[in-house]
Every structure is written in C-alpha cells, then in structure tokens.
Amino acid sequence: MACRGGAGNGHRASATLSRVSPGSLYTCRTRTHNICMVSDFFYPNMGGVESHIYQLSQCLIERGHKVIIVTHAYGNRKGIRYLTSGLKVYYLPLKVMYNQSTATTLFHSLPLLRYIFVRERVTIIHSHSSFSAMAHDALFHAKTMGLQTVFTDHSLFGFADVSSVLTNKLLTVSLCDTNHIICVSYTSKENTVLRAALNPEIVSVIPNAVDPTDFTPDPFRRHDSITIVVVSRLVYRKGIDLLSGIIPELCQKYPDLNFIIGGEGPKRIILEEVRERYQLHDRVRLLGALEHKDVRNVLVQGHIFLNTSLTEAFCMAIVEAASCGLQVVSTRVGGIPEVLPENLIILCEPSVKSLCEGLEKAIFQLKSGTLPAPENIHNIVKTFYTWRNVAERTEKVYDRVSVEAVLPMDKRLDRLISHCGPVTGYIFALLAVFNFLFLIFLRWMTPDSIIDVAIDATGPRGAWTNNYSHSKRGGENNEISETR
C-alpha cells in the first residue's frame, strides 16, 4: 500500500500540518475537502483504474481529507464496507450491463447518489473512467445538486469507429460543464481535449504512480533460462493477437525462452490454441486472473516484461515491471513513450515483426550482461512516480475547483445547447430539466434536513483519524515515560 500514515487533525478554516513521509517533510494546507470517488471499477475487480482510486484515496486520507468511494455491488459484496485507514466504500445494488459497467437510465441512480452525497456532506465529486456509466451519472447529478465536479480520464479513444463516436459524444456532454478534468499523460490530454471539445486550461496532467515498496527486485532470480512476463487483461485492446504471433516465432528461435502470462479475458482461447498447436505447454504458462498482491511475485520470475497494448493512456504495468528490475519491451502507442526514459524501455511498432526485434534486442543485452542491474533500475524508477506526489497535485485541483462557481441551471442549459450541438444539446438539456424536477420531488419527499448525517470515518473530525492520533500520542507518551 502506498500510504499508511494517519491524517492531520486540522479544521476547514485553519492551516494544518500533515505528515506525508517517514522523514521530517510536512505540508502546510489551508483547507480540507469531503471527496466522493465514483466509478464502476473498484475492488474486488482488478485493474489500473481500481488501483488508482484506492491508492489516491489512501494518500488523500493521510493528508487530512475525508474520502468515500461509490461503486456498484460485486456479487455478495453489497452495502457499506470499510477498508484500510477507515476508507468507506458504498457498493450500490445497481445492475451491471457490460464489462462491469452499470446500465443507466440516468434517473434511477439519483435517489441513491443524492442520499449518499447529503449523508456524507460531500463537497467534491471525483469521477473516474470514460467507460463507467456510474461516473457519468454522478457528474450529471452532482451538477444538478450544485456540487463541484472533477473527472479523471484513464483511456485513449479513436475518432472513426461507431463506439468511439458515441463515447466521445457522451464525454462531450459530461465534461462540458465539469469544473476540472485530469488526464494521466500529455497524449491523453490532447486526446481528451479533442474528443470532448474542451478548453485545455481546465485539463491537468497528473500521471499514475506505483508503490515501490510493493514492487522490489528478487535478489535470487534464476539465470539458467530467459523468461518473458506478460501481465494484462487478455482483450483485443491489449494486443493479445500480436502476442499470439510472437510466442511461436521466438520459442522456435530460442530453446531456452519461456513465457509467463498473467491475466484473464476473452482472448485467452487464442493463446491456448497457440500453446496447443505448437506443443508449448512446458514453456508457456497461463496463470489466469491475478490478485494485485500476487503481481510482484509473478513479475520477479521473469527477466523481460512485454506490453503489446494497441492503445494506452498510461501503462502502470510497465512501471511496476521496471520497479521489479525487468527490462521493458513495449509498443510505441498513446502515452507510453512518456512513462519511462529511453534506457529503461525498448519501444516498438505495434506489429509482430517489430516486437520480435525488440525482444531479441533485450535478449541479446541480457545474455551479454549489458542490461542495468535490477536494483539499479528499481532505485531509478522509485523516484519517478509516487502516490503522495499524485495526491498532492490532485489536492491542488480540489483547492482550485472548491472556489469556482457551479453553473446555475439556466447557464448550464445554455452550455449544453451551445457546446453539444443542436440535437444532442437539446436532448440533454431536456434531461437536465427532468433531473432537476426529480431532485425537487425527492427533496419534497425526503428533505435534506431529515437525512441522518453519517459519522466521519476519515477527515479532520473522522473517528478513525482521531483514534489513530490518540493512540499515536499515547504511544509517544509511553515511549517518553520509558526513557525517563
């Protein structure tokens, strides 16, 4: 985990000192926020978005903010759950439509989300992922309720196919009156600005990060053979078709070469067919779905990490692999060239031929001993991306949007009509009016004043925060007494 420390005890109007590292570094802050992270993608589902939300939330809690997470139910995981440091997660009973994204009618989620926002006294809604219907719903409802909104885009999209056109139009509607947008790379920022026709000044670039203490090299790694590791969802976008062409070609050329593939998805059948056709059962291991805690143990079994993605805004997997001391070979797509310096990554075109050449280059460097030592790679990578830095930069975005005005209904309707086109604009302006009327009806049925306010688990007045601070002070007093 990236952040395990306790949060400060400050109040909204006064400056607080929050410890953000084991050393003597302290950060002065003038305000705290009540933040609600919303996305369809969260634990127990595994992926980059899920990890980003969890790690960012933990570091924001450490910095003194109140953070809750809203997602949909996963199996029997329903209701309210508490994670490390008092992080409260609402698992809502909403129907999943496709690929862990909920079905939406826009209005059905308003009663639940409104109740949570009021009960938790939320001031900022932070939605994640263009693929999440719940994230778009939360943005729409938050603006109706007069709350500040932030959106983080984790993906890249094209402009030609039907699905991209529809998603881009939805993104245009969702983001036209959102206070601020965060992208994970400069390539992603350019893509999002073009897709949603945004003002670049309200779009910030804050990359993902990795906890270096969770991804360390194995000093006892075997060198009697060469192992290429792939950890990815086995879907088309991750280039699994390319991987199916690479495996037989390199296995035929290098008898001491093995593959370890972690991940699950509809393209697994292709890899199983390749393994069966070329009789590579003892050289190609398919591990299936991995829990995040097991990823490091898989990575350190290899020498080279292969990423075959066809599109990627920011690939956390290559940072994790480099932190474990592996040589990274990756496709040159999206924001990947921004992630690691040239001496730590071999970039290739998204083709079987180019990737095979890149892997052969890495194999030659490995056999000749010209690759940097895994410990040296780890020491370099651990200084690049840290969750505390991500949290500090995100906090500045929150500070900025907290003083911005939320558009009143009349100006919001004008913005929708002028920004989204004559057809889409009028349709969503009408939906915004219906949503506002539905909100008035809900407030008449159950006024905000009679909704019970939840006891804060995190934040300046959080029960978890105060208990942690009290026990910490008690421990320090005991240490002083013992030294006397």
Swiss-Prot record:
Keywords: Disease variant, Endoplasmic reticulum, Epilepsy, Glycoprotein, Glycosyltransferase, GPI-anchor biosynthesis, Intellectual disability, Lipid metabolism, Membrane, Phosphoprotein, Transferase, Transmembrane, Transmembrane helix. The chain crosses the membrane at residues 422-442. Pathway: Glycolipid biosynthesis; glycosylphosphatidylinositol-anchor biosynthesis. The modification Phosphoserine is found at S21, S24. It comes from Homo sapiens (Human). Its EC number is 2.4.1.198. Glycans are attached at N467. Component of the glycosylphosphatidylinositol-N-acetylglucosaminyltransferase (GPI-GnT) complex composed at least by PIGA, PIGC, PIGH, PIGP, PIGQ, PIGY and DPM2. Interacts with PIGC, PIGH, PIGP, PIGQ and DPM2. Interacts directly with PIGY; this interaction regulates glycosylphosphatidylinositol-N-acetylglucosaminyltransferase activity. Interacts with PIGQ. The gene is PIGA. GO terms for molecular function: phosphatidylinositol N-acetylglucosaminyltransferase activity; UDP-glycosyltransferase activity. It catalyses: a 1,2-diacyl-sn-glycero-3-phospho-(1D-myo-inositol) + UDP-N-acetyl-alpha-D-glucosamine = a 6-(N-acetyl-alpha-D-glucosaminyl)-1-(1,2-diacyl-sn-glycero-3-phospho)-1D-myo-inositol + UDP + H(+). Signal peptide: none annotated. Changing L344P: In NEDEPH; does not fully rescue defective HAMP expression in PIGA-deficient cells overexpressing HJV, suggesting decreased function in GPI anchor biosynthesis and absent or reduced HJV anchorage at the cell membrane. It is found in: Endoplasmic reticulum membrane. Residues 443-484 are lumenal. The lineage of its organism: Eukaryota, Metazoa, Chordata, Craniata, Vertebrata. It holds the Pfam family PIGA. It comes from the Eukaryota. It is linked to Paroxysmal nocturnal hemoglobinuria 1: A disorder characterized by hemolytic anemia with hemoglobinuria, thromboses in large vessels, and a deficiency in hematopoiesis. Red blood cell breakdown with release of hemoglobin into the urine is manifested most prominently by dark-colored urine in the morning. Multiple congenital anomalies-hypotonia-seizures syndrome 2: An X-linked recessive developmental disorder characterized by dysmorphic features, neonatal hypotonia, myoclonic seizures, and variable congenital anomalies involving the central nervous, cardiac, and urinary systems. Most affected individuals die in infancy. SUPFAM superfamilies: UDP-Glycosyltransferase/glycogen phosphorylase. This is Phosphatidylinositol N-acetylglucosaminyltransferase subunit A.
